[in-house]
Amino acid sequence: MNIAITGLGIICAIGNDCQQVLDSLVNKKTGVGMMKYLQSCHKELPVGEVKLSDDELKTLLGLPVGSLYSRTTLLGAVAVKQAMADAGLSADMLVGKKVVLISGTTVGGMDVTERILVEMRDTLQTPNTQQQSPVDYVKRHDCGSTTNEIAQICGLDCEVCTISTACSSAINSIIVGCEMLRSGEADIVIAGGSEALSKFHLNGFNTLHILDTEVCRPFDATRVGLNLGEGAGFVVLQKEDVNAKAYIGGYGNKCDAFHQTASSDDGEGAYLAMREALESSGIDKSQIDYINAHGTGTPNNDPSESVALKRIFGNDIPLVSSTKGFTGHTTSASGSIETVICVLAMQNKFVPVCYGFSHIDEACIHPFEGDDKQHRMDYVICNSFGFGGNDSSLLLMKHDRSLPPPSPVEREPECDNKSPFKGDLEGLGEFIVADITIDSMEQLADYKEYISPKEGRRMGKLMKAATLTSLMALREAGIECPDAIITATANGMLETSEKFLVDMVDNGEETLSPTLFMQSTHNTIGSAIAIRTKCHGYNITYTQGKDSMKWALRDAERLIRMGKAKTVLVGCHDESSPLFQSFYDYLNLSVPQIYSRSVVLKAK
């Protein structure tokens, strides 16, 4: 079954809608420049900002200017509304249908939290009168809340899901959306991602010394780093092909299982993701017309991706470019923003140039530099590779294509009009072969059988607990390396993130720790377990508040019942942290200090 893309929505540094973005690409106009809205001291760093203030975005959405929303929410709502309108859908038309909104983000509400953190802390010194106070924003800080708010602003009364796999989040949202359509869990999926620039974000990447002080130059011999960007991209996915803009023919989600921030020299994760996208589509590699590369412009990513491309295509590599010289690296939103860009290129038969490229690097592929020709754009691959080696690829097709019958291991379950996957452990009893929980600090004391003292000293309590329950569950199940790793977390590495945030707010932006930032992404746990177990299989992280585990279990059951995995490690991991615990206490919210549960599912 090929999934139809029936609506497109985009807002980024080169335009506030599809037409503006198309014009900028055709006219080779970059959106990367001096920061205007982000209030950072690092003015030397160019960024790909959306050319609208928060107040202008609120006005565009019909929201009160005085209302408090994260920029992630606002950008996402703009793109979702565009995609719905492009598909000819209104909220009223969706009543009675199984609709799902899936968004990818990592920043979530951080742009607001960092701005009002001092005010939030000061409020702790005053009595809680049960009226709205700055502390209340802690309930909206998380990634899942931004997706809830996007749905609310767009009038969507539907299932809501958030995925956070760093820079591959948005493509993974699209992949999950396709799987839900194939399984009968949804009639219509609106999938993509949204990410706002924040000081936390900017300074984190800056501590890694991978930001360029000029416009980035992917695959260029003189490249030194990336430019951060922001924006949102969403697509409407349907099984019907009415007014289809393009089709999704295949996709791959694999893990490099190499390092938390660096890509392997042989590009294993990228290679496996592209190979799976090709195999699942039935398209021969010789038919690919264009590849939108992840191409960040960093010294590490570009040669690694180039090796992966050469492993797939040999000496016959299709036209390749990275569009991050136009938009900046929009991190969690990059996959969906670039998916929309790919569809625009397919519709208009042009290949976006690799902006900024001028010097050949023998260690990299030679990207497309531009011409005046129209190009066949029938089959296109879009790559997104994230921290932790969460690598995903999407294969887009201009026309519908009848595929050969699926093999027995790829058969789809027979479904009625109800969701076949409930996301609860009770319904999965037949598959559960191990179930381990840690919910107290005392249980972390005896970890040395699984974690060395040296490792333990470097780990925070959540990483220690997650590693312990995961390895104990795998041992109990008699499995060294699972086929897939699925993680659920409401707040991710909260203690690590809090330390970085507080240090930045209290001591400025100049002396921050790269180690803290490297361990702040929500997919840190899932990727660390993959690295430890050498698992190159499917790897994803759900972050939808209290429903995170439900989404993770639904995905795991789907993989098993559809024959895509025989063994799946599912983990639910969350923690509290000193300052955030003070906020929770102030609001009389009950949050455990530590909670880690790992379950192994095995097909019969």
Predicted regions and their residues:
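A short local structural element in Rossmann-fold oxidoreductases
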Residues: L202
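Short conserved active-site loop signatures built around small residues
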Residues: A170
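Active-site histidine-anchored catalytic micro-motif
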Residues: S173
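Conserved "HGTGT" condensation-loop signature of ketosynthase/thiolase-family condensing enzymes
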Residues: M1-C158, E179, S198, N206-N227, ...
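A short, small-residue-rich loop immediately preceding and capping a beta-strand
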Residues: E159-T165, D187-G193, V568-H573
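Short glycine/serine-rich loop segments
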Residues: C178-L197
